A protein has these predicted regions:
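Mature, function-bearing regions of proteins
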Residues: 1-210
């Protein structure tokens, strides 16, 4: 079985202009997992575990509802509940940070859902906060190779980010490159610009300990 899951070596940029200007850039990696490949991927990689401790671990309880149902089932149920027609064998691709040595740090995850013809159907941006709360935002409007959504935030993220702002999501469909932007607006004024961009690498044991 040829696996399509991959790792992205990413550059994260965050630039806030209000209430006080602050900017940082740092490098991270993100896993891009076809959820149908999760079990064979863990068999292929010595340092990745599914619902068990390892150097890197993927726990279903960390995604969407805090229960141990399969993440794919939770994704499909969520989009159906929100008006998207989906069949059980649709593909779900998840871009996320795994647990590292059991520690959870995952500010945002991105889900991309594909139909039987591998055409993108919708995306979900799941935003987390410092209290380990999570809120999903469903993106169904596609502009070219991107899903777009501007929506009232209605979610506490940090002391520097008020509840009455808008999120503006722009999620490019993952391929050889990852290109994701999340901005915040106060009316017409953009007060936060953030992006995650990176290049795809193969999943190997060597890459996981590099």
């Amino acid at each position: 079985m040829e696996l399509t899951s991959r790792i992205y070596e990413c550059r994260v940029m965050h630039h806030r202009t209000s209430p006080k200007e602050h900017r940082f850039v740092h490098r991270i990696f993100m896993f891009c997992i076809d959820l149908d490949e999760l079990n064979p991927l863990c068999k292929h990689l010595s340092f990745l575990g599914h619902n068990r401790f390892n150097l890197y671990s993927f726990y279903d309880i960390d995604h969407l509802q805090k229960n141990d149902r399969s993440t794919k089932d939770k994704v499909l149920d969520y989009i159906r509940e929100n008006g998207v027609k989906a069949e059980d064998h649709f593909k779900v691709q998840l871009v996320t940070l795994p647990r590292i040595m059991g520690y959870v740090f995952n500010p945002v995850s991105f889900y991309f859902v594909y139909n039987n013809e591998r055409q993108p159907v919708c995306a979900i941006a799941e935003v987390g906060n410092t209290y380990h709360e999570m809120k999903p935002y469903l993106l169904t409007v596609q502009q070219g190779e991107r899903f777009r959504l501007r929506v009232p935030k209605h979610f506490y993220v940090s002391p520097f980010s008020r509840l009455d702002l808008d999120f503006d999501f722009s999620l490019a469909i993952p391929g050889d490159q990852l290109n994701i932007h999340i901005n915040e607006y106060e009316g017409k004024n953009r007060i936060l610009t953030s992006s995650v961009t990176g290049s795809a690498q193969s999943f190997t044991n060597r890459k996981l300990i590099w």
